[in-house]
A protein has these predicted regions:
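Intrinsically disordered, low-complexity regions
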Residues: 12-13, 49, 60, 94, ...
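Generic, ordered loop/turn and secondary-structure boundary motif
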Residues: 2, 8-11, 25, 57, ...
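Short, structured loop/turn "capping" segments at alpha-beta junctions
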Residues: 45-48, 103-107
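Short, basic/glycine-rich phosphate-binding loops at helix/coil junctions
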Residues: 9-16, 68-77, 152
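Internal, conserved structured core segments that host functional sites
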Residues: 32-88
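Flexible, glycine/proline-enriched loop segments at strand-loop-helix junctions
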Residues: 17-25, 79-86, 161
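Surface-exposed, charge/polar-rich loops and edge strands
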Residues: 33-36, 40, 73-74, 82-84, ...
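A short aromatic-anchored loop/beta-hairpin motif
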Residues: 1-49
Length: 207
């Protein structure tokens, strides 16, 4: 859409967050081209295109606004199908890789550890749980070492994965960015701290 609206798809947070707006331009022509170039893994069905109804939810604007506060960059948001296997999300990321050659920044907005149910506020809120530190460490090592199979097979970590992600929507974005990366290209992590004891703020850059 030409001017995606700012969506506040959350609850229980300070009112100042609900007042936030991020009036970036959309890129409807680019969105059409991207949609036409993608197929759903397995079925090979086309990927749908929404030019009217949704907009930018907090997974997009809450990250992009600090990065580009002038709101002068065109943005296309890609929705995720949570019912699909992790390998399917990675495969879509691989299809997006060619966009990087045209100056497109691919942002996977999530958290390597995200468990709000276990969030701890007050005294020492950033002193993370042992399980949160361990999951973040394992996934961080997989990213650094290029273990893309392990990155996709995160559920093999069993209860550790369940504690880190009671639901998976905050983990899946890293599979898109990892899929879009060129094998062997440089990768680095930064901001490797925690918030509220159960949310990893680790950020990763490929290239």
């Amino acid at each position: 859409m030409a001017r995606p609206k700012t969506i506040h798809d959350f609850g229980g947070f300070p009112q100042e967050l609900f007042a936030q707006q991020y009036p970036v331009p959309g890129a409807p022509l680019a969105a059409k081209e991207i949609s036409a170039s993608l197929v759903q893994p397995g079925s090979k069905d086309p990927v749908g295109l929404d030019l009217t109804d949704w907009g930018l939810d907090h997974g997009s604007w809450s990250v992009l606004k600090p990065m580009f506060p002038a709101a002068d960059i065109p943005v296309v948001q890609l929705s995720m199908d949570y019912e699909r296997a992790a390998q399917d999300h990675f495969a879509v990321g691989q299809q997006l890789a060619g966009l990087r050659d045209h100056g497109v920044l691919i942002v996977g907005s999530g958290n390597l550890v995200h468990n709000l149910r276990a969030a701890r506020f007050g005294l020492q809120p950033n002193q993370a749980y042992d399980w949160a530190i361990e999951f973040d460490k394992v996934v961080g090592h997989q990213i650094d070492s290029g273990d893309l199979a392990g990155l996709q097979d995160f559920q093999r970590l069993g209860s550790l994965a369940q504690q880190a992600h009671p639901s998976f929507e905050h983990y899946l974005p890293v599979l898109y960015t990892a899929g879009a990366a060129t094998p062997g290209e440089p990768v680095r992590s930064f901001n490797t701290n925690f918030q509220a004891a159960s949310i990893s703020m680790r950020s990763v850059v490929w290239g």
